[in-house]
A protein has these predicted regions:
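N-terminal mature-domain region immediately after signal-peptide cleavage
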Residues: 1-170
Length: 170
């Protein structure tokens, strides 16, 4: 029996909240976190349940596992760390909560996702621009906690993506 507080609307029809963010990585994250705080909480509840059911670990154990990935993320993508810190502050959650959401695949599975990627090379797309896309082949029940995120990064291409609330990317 699933406790009342753990029951998720698995058949809920998703709608996607559009969140547009700009500024430094931390500023983008803070705006994103405050705009999606309810969905982030639901996403944490969702993965807490998923970790228990699929990996037989509780949320604090998942956080400890996720922390093992932090040095690599800091080394290769420090802006993601800053964005996650901003999300945590904006959503009034711990950094560990947001990091754990972003390491959910690594915590749940030791295999690659089944997502597909596509690229339209320079000169072949509209206005000659490069376009990159990826499918989202994940648990359908996670859609209810997803948002459409429009990211404006200084000196970098803008990004429009569907992502689970609290996730960074780009």
């Amino acid at each position: 029996v699933v406790p009342k507080e753990r029951k998720l609307q698995l058949n809920a029809k998703p709608y996607y909240q559009l969140i547009e963010i700009k500024g430094t990585a931390f500023e983008r994250g803070k705006r994103y976190g405050s705009s999606a705080s309810g969905a982030i909480k639901r996403n944490i509840d969702f993965y807490s349940f998923a970790f228990e059911k699929s990996a037989n670990i509780d949320w604090p154990q998942a956080q400890k596992l996720a922390m093992k990935f932090l040095p690599v993320i800091e080394k290769y993508c420090p802006s993601y760390v800053e964005e996650m810190k901003g999300i945590a502050e904006g959503a009034e959650r711990s950094f560990e909560d947001i990091l754990t959401l972003n390491c959910r695949s690594e915590v749940l599975f030791a295999k690659a996702d089944a997502c597909s990627c596509i690229i339209i090379p320079e000169g072949r797309g509209k206005n000659g621009h490069v376009f990159i896309g990826q499918t989202w082949d994940w648990m359908a029940s996670a859609r209810q906690n997803s948002v459409v995120l429009k990211v404006h990064q200084e000196g970098e291409p803008s990004i429009l993506m569907i992502c689970e609330a609290g996730m960074v990317g780009g």
